[in-house]
Amino acid sequence: VKVLKTAALVLLLLANRANVAESHLSADQAKVLEAVRASALKYSHQLPDFICTQTTHRNVFKGIRNFANAANVNPRPDPLTHDTIEEQLTYAGGRESYTVLTINKKKAGNADHLQFTGVMSSGEFGTIFKDVFDPASNTAFSWERETKSNGRHVWVFKYRVPRESGTALIDQGTHKAFVVPYAGEVFIDPETNDFLEITSTLEIPSDFSIQRVDRKIDYAVQKIAGKDYCLPIHSELHMEQGVLVFDNRIDFSNYHHFSTESTLHFGDEAKQ
């Protein structure tokens, strides 16, 4: 389950049931999409137990509309607030858990991942792919384009998850709830069936307190215990609420096999 939390919002991905839909796909495109679907549904169960470092750079801006399309404006405006949160992410038994190590390079004490004010995210390790590719979600896929990325041949598919399998938005001020559809693109290497990137945008009612939520996750092959796995290396999350824009940039690094002797890193220190 993916949770994004602010003072006014909790986002929960629902798990309703229906059938996968495909439109305007060639036989080869449908074959690749089906192979990726099978991989996505098994993904979290095939990952080994591991530890990595998750570093989240959070900024809050004021007065920037359509921030996702203006994020590369130069010079970028100064944020109202910003912080950097370094966490140890432990993946064991198919579940993610987080230990907050530092906040702005200072030891974090007893801070908890989901108790921060502002926006935090989770679920990059297979949850979003399972929700999109699960036949129960009734996701509609269509062909978008062919491109290149870092020297790799890439096929891009558009997708849309309907309202009945969508995302629940709950306004914590009014307790008013909506379930909204979401849509995006998935980037696939057709030779290896690796997923390289996924994007999503929530289709939010105009009268809701949150105007926009966009997410992007980049994946690459990482080696753990001598074997290759396709894992997140970077994620971005943008949310617009009133005149405020919440902008998270998340990096994943230092993947290694989980063991009882794994090392925790605190900034420049290492603690056994």
Locate the predicted segments by residue:
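Structured extracytoplasmic
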Residues: 20-183, 190-197, 201-215, 220-272
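Bacterial N-terminal signal peptides that target proteins for export
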Residues: 1-8
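Hydrophobic h-region of N-terminal signal peptides that target proteins for export
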Residues: 8-19
